[in-house]
Amino acid sequence: MSGWYEISQAKDGQYRFVLKAGNGEIILTSELYKAKASAENGIASVQKNSSDDARYERLVAKNDKPYFNLKAANHQVIGTSQFYASEQSRDKGIESVKNNGTTATVKDLTG
């Protein structure tokens, strides 16, 4: 099964999206957006940029946990991964976003 996007609304009324792999695991999380349309535009940007390896910023957090950001052509962060136990695990996460990021399936959980 291929992955999908979910749009949800935070308690403060802002919107975010996540990209889930086919197994239901969250592999990318967006920032918070004031408008639902902005979250939808963020999804479109992931769909466009996720297959380009140059768009991934491979990082290590202060707690020494590897993670990554997916950036648009304008260098703005579109989404951020979880923290991983190793760089190898992070790189598998990037491959998962590449494989699932182009999906057109969007589940709107905002009601």
UniProtKB/Swiss-Prot annotation:
Family under the similarity heading: Belongs to the UPF0339 family. Duplicated subfamily.
The name this protein goes by in its record: UPF0339 protein ACIAD0721
Cross-referenced Pfam families: DUF1508
Superkingdom of this protein's organism: Bacteria
Keywords associated with the record: Repeat
Keyword set includes Repeat: yes
Coiled coil: none
